[in-house]
Each structure stands twice: as C-alpha cells, then as structure tokens.
C-alpha cells in the first residue's frame, strides 16, 4: 500500500512576488559569477508596491550594474506597466548589499593545504522516486507544469488577458504507491479586468489543465477550482510582499520529502544550503535510476568551516534492493559530498541559477542542471 492515499503539492508562477524575489536574487548571483566564479554571494530581495530592495553580503572582484539588471528581470517576467500593477522601468530599486564577514571567509575559503569548508552548518535533503519519468513526485511535477503552461500562454499572446501572478495545486490519488487519478486541481491566475470569469474558467480548464494533466487521471469526480475566490486582478507585489526564500517546498519536492530549512536562491555554491541540496538530488536520482530503490531520501549535514559532512543517512522507505547501510557505503564510494567535491562534481561555479528560480530546481532535465544527470547509475547497478 502507498504511504499516502492522496497527496497534494502546490507551485507558483514566475510572476508570484516570492518567485520574483528569487529570480532577482539569482540574476544578481549569475551576473557576479559570470566574471568572478569564486565570488561569495548571499543576496536577498524584497518586492512590494513600486519598489525592489536587495540586501545581503557579497565578496567579489567584479562590478555589476544592479539597478539595470533588476529592472530587466522584472520586465522579463512581465511586469512592464502600471496596468498590471508593477513596472520594472519605473519602480524604485534600493541596494543594501555589503561585504561578506571576514570571520566567515576565514573558515570557508580554500588554502593551499586546505579543502573548502562548508559555508554554514545545516542539514540538507535530496529525494527521488520512480513515479514519474524524471524521478520526481508527481504532485509537484504537475503543479509546476500547470503554472509553466500559464506563463507560456501569457507570453505567446494566445491568452492576452493572462497576467504574471498565478498559483497551482494538484491532489493525486495513490494506489499501491503509484499515482492513478487527479482528485482535485486548483489554478488561480491573475487576469485583466476586461475578461469574464466564464472565459477564464473555460480557457484554464481546456488549454492549461487538460493540456498538462494526463487524461486518464481526470475523472467525473475530479474537482476543478479555477480562480475560486472570483476575480484576481490585483496581484504580484501590489497584492503581496515578495521575499527571497519563502517558497522552499515549491522549490524542492512539494512536501513529499523532508527539507532542511535552507533556501536556495541568491546563494553561491559555497553555501551548502544550495549546493548540498543539489548534490542530494543527484545522489538520490542516481540511486533510483540504478534500480537500487523505488524511492530514496538522503540527508547530509555539515559544520561551518569543516569539509567532511558530519553525517550522511539514507532512507529507501522499504523499497531498497539493498540494505540502506549498503547504499550509504556506495554513496561514499561514488560521490564526493565535501563542498569542493560536490561543486566540482556538478560544475556549480557557473551563471546557471536564474533559470532554477521558477518552476522547480529539480525534475527539469535542462542542459545546465547537472544534478539531474543519471551518469552514475550504471556504476551503482553493479552492486546488485
């Protein structure tokens, strides 16, 4: 039997205010890494009516025109007019970025005889399951695809009344550990004042929901909740303040796996909150791809300034073809989970992060998403 009879996950679009903040933080990170791959970056963003504020700590040898960059990110998302409630061309941009603490740098930097220490203490999780082709939990996978489709139809002009802010939620029914039906789907989308609710409901149901969710999972009792509160004209940073790092479950596994609590966006790869979570996904995905388990969760923990993980644990939820203790031995043999090792293993010192900041850090097999590769699976299979 499945651990859950039903399970629900949610996602939000690139125009959601928290996701705007994530994208701005990661755009700043990318701009710095482009010229200075060894930079130390920790950037937080706040967006609210008429303003975007960035703050944090950076140590770099390069210069970035932050104001122009931030404005362009906002415009690219689709906030380009007061008619939609926010305009990247005219909003205020405030910069409160300072230098990284020398005390932190002393413990984290690499020396001639020293490995890179972890940028902070903490615990991170990685997860994979064979219930989808990309080895992600189905509820979060399809929740992402719904809001991604909303953005596609908005940007193409096919549904010109769509606006950038949107949220989705998918409830799947499980039988014997596999998803078999959609019990409920929620999609709320910002829209122009001129469109009627009936048109919104029909277009969202036919062009978004039915184009994304498997037809065999939709049934006569599936609940469709489309803009259930009625009109959704006021959205984005006007409707809600947006902050970096407030969608950590959307960013990861939709609640299907545990989370260490650290956000990803705006952090360079010396911050294990991000890099070790990516490495955890890489490890778990390769374990499942190798057939060692149907699902796998890994936890890794670190102490600030110390290279070796303080712990590595594995849980295959009774689906492992080998004991979990044996799988941990394989992980230690095939994966270097020290900060420098995982940065090199996944080639993380690159300007690749803005594209991670909307529609999921995991489960999208894009060329730059090295943590989604299954290139260790063949070697792991030999243990069977």
Swiss-Prot record:
Free-text remark on how the cofactor is bound: Binds 2 divalent ions per subunit. Binds 1 potassium ion per subunit.
Positions bound to ATP: 16, 165-167, 240, 246-247, 263, 267
Binding site for L-methionine: 57, 100, 240, 271
InterPro entries: ADOMET_SYNTHASE_CS, S-AdoMet_synt_C, S-AdoMet_synt_central, S-AdoMet_synt_N, S-AdoMet_synthetase, S-AdoMet_synthetase_sfam
Stretches of the chain forming a coiled coil according to its record: none
SUPFAM superfamilies assigned: S-adenosylmethionine synthetase
Reactions catalysed: L-methionine + ATP + H2O = S-adenosyl-L-methionine + phosphate + diphosphate
Region feature Flexible loop, mapped onto this chain: 100-110
Chief location of this protein within or outside the cell: cytoplasm
Oligomer status and interactors: Homotetramer; dimer of dimers.
Family: Belongs to the AdoMet synthase family.
Protein name: S-adenosylmethionine synthase
Source organism of the structure: Cellvibrio japonicus (strain Ueda107)
High-level lineage: Bacteria, Pseudomonadati, Pseudomonadota, Gammaproteobacteria, Cellvibrionales
